[in-house]
Amino acid sequence: MAGLVEKDIRLLLKRKQTVILFLAISFLLGFTTDGSFVIAYLTVLCAIFTASTISYDEFDNGYTFLMTLPIDCKTYVAEKYAFCIGGGFIAWNFAVIFYFVSAVIKGDSINLSEDMMMAVVFIPVYIIMLCIMIPIQLKYGGYKSRIVLLVLWGIIALIGFVGAKALAGLNVSIDGLVKILDQIPDIAFAVIGIAITVLIMVISIACSRKIMEKKEY
């Protein structure tokens, strides 16, 4: 697995100019927008960037070559999830540090417990996003997966919009729902969030393994 990780790192280093550009944009956003935005931006961006290594693997019969090495489909899938999630976590740490540094420089007030709780919310979000992206990219390839993901995000946005309209039509107060949720202990939210994230990850990994096993090399 170490060899696969090194391969992916070298693939990303070939795009170091893009990485530098993204970091520069993150730096500007950190000082010109709400600092919390840079945490979401940099974490999600890195997750997408690391997942793009799948496209390189399939290019020019790359899978055929990889499967001649002493690895199997399970090892490849495990490495891909570990690399993408690990890369996103590194970016998250960098973004959190940058958030606090920029807040100090701008003279913004800092509430460590609330700010960290806000930042931690982005971890399961980007992991779930990766759990959706990776099997789709393995199944449909680089080009088709972009179309599938675009349609999927559109459907999710439409469901959210229709759901909000339906609640408004039923005279259900969004603020009332928020107040009810605020009464739930933070630890309960954390346990539920972790459980849902782990469940989605297990299902996603199982799907990715089946997709890789069905491929012809």
PLM regions: where:
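Short helix-to-coil transition segments within interhelical loops
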Residues: T68-C73
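Alpha-helix N-cap/helix-start motif at helix boundaries, enriched for small hydrophobics
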Residues: T75-V77
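Hydrophobic alpha-helical transmembrane segments of membrane proteins
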Residues: M1-N61, E79-Y217
